[in-house]
């Protein structure tokens, strides 16, 4: 059993889906036998507190959610072998902390209205995508990012910009990726705006596989 810190603090836009999403994500982790602590307290990110944590999940966080001590603690803990998973607006967090872009892989800039579009699997061998069809019709809030993920990130999913209005990344438009941060592991998905999306078996399996991939990578090798 591992200790997981589920973090949903917001200081900017707050998604109405957070409560249901936290129940679903927490349930997936508890179903695997893990001890989940759900918090919005930034002081949970202290070196001594993180020492017993295996994974932190940033679920639809937004704005500046940590203080300087928490930022230093998170970066050190993750670089030393921790695990970070980000869901949806996690990339809309910590806009004044440059290092966070290296943790999350990219930074959110804007999005159009919720629309249905085609999601394409890029890496079918990853635990978060192995269950998905090659092309998947999904309704969500399609994020644009300041840049494409860094070269050390593996893009897992893209969305077809031709299918909806408001995409500005060009093709391919990444929406999920994974990669290292020092000796630590990261995974991010932009999916998960609407509360009812978390009732979709495909999205649940996508989330479950992503969480498992950073929490227990040896199980998914």
Positions of PLM-derived features:
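Catalytic beta-strand/loop cores that center a nucleophilic Ser/Cys/Thr
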Residues: 30, 37, 106, 111-182
């Amino acid at each position: 059993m591992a200790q997981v810190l589920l973090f949903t603090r917001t200081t900017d836009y707050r998604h109405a889906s957070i409560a249901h999403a936290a129940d679903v994500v927490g349930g997936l982790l508890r179903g695997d036998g893990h001890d989940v602590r759900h918090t919005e307290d930034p002081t949970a990110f202290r070196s001594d507190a993180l020492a017993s944590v295996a994974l932190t999940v940033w679920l639809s966080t937004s704005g500046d959610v940590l203080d300087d001590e928490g930022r230093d603690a998170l970066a050190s803990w993750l670089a030393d072998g921790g695990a970070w998973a980000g869901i949806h607006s996690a990339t809309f967090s910590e806009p004044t902390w440059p290092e966070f872009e290296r943790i999350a892989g990219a930074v959110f800039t804007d999005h159009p209205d919720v629309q249905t579009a085609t999601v394409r699997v890029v890496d079918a061998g990853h635990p978060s995508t192995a269950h998905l069809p090659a092309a998947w019709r999904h309704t969500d809030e399609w994020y644009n990012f300041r840049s494409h993920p860094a070269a050390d990130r593996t893009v897992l999913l893209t969305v077809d910009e031709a299918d909806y209005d408001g995409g500005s990344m060009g093709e391919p438009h990444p929406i999920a990726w994974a990669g290292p941060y020092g000796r630590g592991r990261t995974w991010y998905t932009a999916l998960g705006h609407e509360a009812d999306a978390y009732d979709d078996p495909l999205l649940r399996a996508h989330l479950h596989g992503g969480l498992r991939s950073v929490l227990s990578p040896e199980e998914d090798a």
